[in-house]
Amino acid sequence: MHNFSDQCLDLARSLLSNNLQHINEDGSVTPAPGEQARVDEPGHAALAIGEFFRATGEVELGEHDLYDLTARCVTQQAFVEEENDNGIAYASLGLLSFGASKERNAVWERLLDPTREQLDRGLLERSEYDDHFQAFSIAKSVARFSFGLTKKDDTGKVIDRFVEGIEKNSSGGFCNDDPNGPSGVYDIYGLLSFIFVRQALQLHANVHLKDRKLPKLRTFAEKYLRMLPD
C-alpha cells in the first residue's frame, strides 16, 4: 500500500495522461463531448501541467513533452482575443511553475518573441474587481514582478484590495461574488479564490510577501473550513 501522497501523485499522473491527448497542436483544448470550449482552458491546462512538474520534476509524461505542451498552451492563451484575466492568470502561474524568472525557465525559452511580447502586454494590463476575479489580478501581479516586467512589487496592495472587498461586502467575512445584488452570491468561487492566491504566493519571487500576507488571508479561509462537516 502506497502512502497517501504517492496515491495522490499516481492519481494526478493518471488524470493528466488521459487529458493531454486533448491538447491540440496550436495549444487549444478539445472539449469533452457535450461541452463547449472555454477561452481560458489553455491557461488552465498550462497550470495543471506546471503543478504536476513542480510536484514530480518529470518533464515527460508518456509520449508528451511537458515543456512543449505548456509552451503551446501559453501561446494559445496569450493570443485569445476576448478579455480573459482568468486564462492569463492561470497561464502565467503555469509558466512560473517551471522557474521563478525568465532566465531560468525552460518553457519561457520555447516561447517565440511575439508570444513573449503578447504575454507581457496581457500581464501589464491592470484591473480591479469586486468578485473572485480579484484573485486573478493577484496572480498577474505576481507574474509581473517575478518575470521582471516591473521593479516595484504591487502584489501586497492588490491582496489588500481583495481583503477590503471581503470586509466591505460581507458581514460574515466570506467572499461575496455579487456585492451589488440584493442578497449576494456566496459559492465555491470564494474558496477557490483563497486556493488560487495561496498558489500564486508560493510561486512569487518575493518570498517574504507570503509570510506577511498569509496570516490575514488564513483568518478568512478558515471560515470556510469550519463549514465542512466532521
List PLM regions with ranges.
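Aromatic-lined, polymer-binding surfaces characteristic
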Residues: 34-56, 63-221, 227-230
